[in-house]
Curated annotation (Swiss-Prot):
Domain P/Homo B per the UniProt entry, residue ranges: 446-580
Name of the molecule in the record: Proprotein convertase subtilisin/kexin type 4
UniProt-recorded Gene Ontology molecular function terms: serine-type endopeptidase activity
Top-level EC class: hydrolase
Domain of life, source organism: Eukaryota
């Protein structure tokens, strides 16, 4: 064959290969026989629709009367096309506010399969075998073991009768959303593919001092399991799993997500986003549910966890991995949304994580970021035992402060605008359980979350090989010009753009205080030409920085090809609080409060009533000048106390406790004449 013909054939083969990769990265949706429907008249209307159109009403998706799960036995269980007939019928119904035929969602467990190595009998990551471990023994020595905290593992089930799990097993924190029954027992297969959830559960709450296997980080916490990954995964299944018993479960731990293949951009559907929102606003009696998420195992494919809409949600706490030697594991994904890091393993000769396994066994072969997230969930359970009144945002602030660079090795460690070291590989560093609990005991409640939305680009703009888009932020104020945000928390960039080869485009953001955060780095396997459609990137690297000043969005072609594209719109979303969080002590301070449970509460005495101040009603600030003028004898209280607000209508003996939660009212009556500085 002549050289010209050879080159032609090679080019054709290469083109076909690239097309195959492109098709694989843009799979068509697979529609199933389930619909999510939102109706205005609740259960009766859902029943009427089901009878009229031949659906089976499988009940509410959330614990209210709006969203329902309908299934049609006459529709194919899997199809490449939606059912247009039912779409048109539901669209004509005036009481149907929204509906969506469900599609299968590809979700992979974030564990790693490695060759069998000799058994490691010691849990090196928490028994002081290494100098800088997770510092869990310090917390155990204080008598904290997770008692009173409930954790649920969202995965492929949990072996509830395991000798190291049955004593802590909580059926109220468990369910099977694959078969819709209360039993989360995993399905057994010849290769034990459904061992993942049982392994994660043992890391959190394996029973201690029973002569079997090892001990969980929070070995007296109650543990549940949700079976949801061993079957058809839809938006309904994910939302129901994340909404299970939100007033009973404190922490959900998830070690799964979209495919870590270096070319997928995917995230939660509408129902799952709603489940996250409801969890943090209504869960735990309004304190907010904790969603702990594994950051991902796509490092081998140069994946980036900011292309995963679960790990980069402001409602989840994303956890990365490091090895015993403090190195970046080969599977680890670097991204700006990671908060913190715990241990796992790297190469096959590295020691791994000891935990429970199927068939009433133990294993020392648990690894990947799947192993890291449950360790963090257990440590947060210890912090919640120390201070049950922490909100979901309080815990995120505490994790930032309780993570330390320690011995973690990476070339991208940087100091942000408030002096903290941060890395795309590790977030703020290795989570220290002892420091986390010490801070939790004396933590004062964070002021309410504020949000600023700033439009950066609103007209289509061609993307240059290297483009910088500046935006001066001066409007994070309310109508009275009071600053809404003084200290940042999460920062998001929401944008839509087209690009001829998406994986070649690097996007970064620089804050007014000079912190540069890479929102997405080059992904060589992502050859998609679809760009990003209304995608949200998130960074934790600006935590506690001042948002006022010049922000700069950068876009740069990092590939070997000439690429073209258009930035259609871009919005900067700033979340934070009106308090200057840098003024708070960065290390635990001695508490003068006699009961740690009221570390977040101010109690004052007036006319024989104990008034209780809760952070959900008024902000806590220092100094009398910052307070609303008190109208009762609270004026005469010692000025060394922070702001103390009397209950309204103090003249009535029946009214002072109105508006308080049941827990707050009980505390107000029973704690006696203690007054704590807030």
């Amino acid at each position: 064959m002549r050289p010209s013909q050879t080159a032609l054939w090679l080019g054709l083969v290469l083109s076909l290969a690239l097309l195959a990769v492109g098709w694989a990265s843009a799979r068509p949706p697979i529609y199933v026989s389930s619909w999510a429907v939102r109706v205005t008249k609740g259960y009766q209307e859902a029943e009427r629709l089901a009878r009229k159109f031949g659906f089976v009403n499988l009940g509410q998706i959330f614990p209210d009367d709006q969203y329902f799960h309908l299934r049609h036995r006459g529709v194919a269980q899997q199809s490449l096309t939606p059912h247009w007939g039912h779409r048109l019928r539901l669209k004509k119904e005036p009481k149907v506010r929204w509906f969506e035929q469900q599609t299968l969602r590809r979700r992979v467990k974030r564990s790693l399969v490695v060759p069998t190595d000799p058994w490691f009998s010691k849990q090196w990551y928490m028994n002081k075998e290494i100098e800088q471990d997770l510092n869990i023994l310090k917390v155990w020595n204080q008598g904290l073991t997770g008692r009173g905290v409930v954790v649920s593992i969202l995965d492929d089930g949990i072996e509830k009768d395991h000798p190291d799990l049955w004593a802590n097993y909580d059926p109220l924190a468990s369910y099977d959303f694959n078969d819709y029954d209360p039993d989360p027992q995993p399905r057994y297969t010849p290769n034990d593919e459904n061992r993942h959830g049982t392994r994660c559960a043992g890391e959190v709450s394996a029973t201690a001092n029973n002569g079997f296997c090892g001990a969980g980080v929070a070995f007296n916490a109650r543990i549940g399991g949700v079976r949801m990954l061993d079957g058809a995964i839809t938006d309904i299944v994910e939302a129901q799993s994340l909404s299970l018993q939100p007033q009973h479960i404190h922490i959900y731990s998830a070690s799964w997500g979209p495919e870590d293949d270096g070319r997928t951009v995917d995230g939660p559907g509408l129902l799952t986003q709603e489940a996250f929102r409801r969890g943090v606003t209504k869960g735990r009696q309004g304190l907010g549910t904790l969603f702990i998420w594994a950051s991902g195992n796509g490092g081998l494919h140069y994946d980036n966890c900011n292309c995963d809409g679960y790990t980069n949600s402001i409602h989840t706490l994303s956890v990365g991995s490091t090895t015993r030697q403090g190195r970046v594991p080969w599977y680890s994904e670097a991204c700006a949304s990671t908060f913190t890091t715990t241990f796992s393993s790297g190469v096959v000769t590295d020691p791994q994580i000891v935990t429970t396994d199927l068939h009433h066994q133990c294993t020392d072969k648990h690894t990947g970021t799947s192993a890291s997230a449950p360790l963090a969930a257990g440590m947060i359970a210890l912090a919640l035992e120390a201070n049950p009144l922490l909100t979901w945002r309080d815990l995120q602030h505490l994790v930032v402060r309780a993570s330390r660079p320690a011995q973690l090795q990476a070339e991208d460690w940087r100091i942000n605008g408030v002096g903290r070291q941060v890395s795309h590989h590790y977030g703020y560093g290795l989570l220290d359980a002892g420091l986390l609990v010490d801070l939790a005991r004396v933590w004062l409640p964070t002021k309410p979350q504020k949000k600023c939305t700033i439009r950066v680009v609103h007209t289509p703009t061609p993307i240059l090989p290297r483009m910088l888009v500046p935006k001066n932020v001066t409007v994070c104020c309310d109508g009275s010009r009071r600053r809404l945000i003084r200290s940042l928390e999460h920062v998001q960039v929401q944008l839509s753009l087209s690009y001829s080869r998406r994986g070649d485009l690097e996007i970064f953001l620089t804050s007014p205080m000079g912190t540069r955060s890479t929102l997405v780095a080059i992904r060589p396997l992502d050859i998609s030409g679809q760009g990003y459609n209304n995608w949200i990137f998130m960074s934790t690297h600006y935590w506690d920085e001042d948002p006022q000043g010049l922000w700069t969005l950068g876009l740069e072609n990092k590939g070997y090809y000439y690429n073209t594209g258009t930035l259609y719109y871009c919005t900067l979303l700033l979340y934070g609080t009106a308090e200057d969080m840098t003024a708070r002590p960065q290390t635990p301070q001695e508490s003068h409060c006699p009961l740690s449970i009221v570390a977040e509460l101010c109690l004052i005495s007036s006319k024989q009533w104990w008034w209780l101040y809760s952070h959900t009603q008024q902000p806590v600030t220092k100094g009398q000048d910052s307070c609303h003028p008190p109208t009762t004898p609270a004026r005469q209280l010692d000025q060394r106390l922070h702001c103390l607000f009397p209950a309204p209508h103090a003249g009535s003996a029946s009214e002072p406790l109105q508006g308080l939660s049941p827990l707050a009212a009980i505390l107000a009556i029973s704690l006696g004449p203690w007054c704590c500085p807030c």
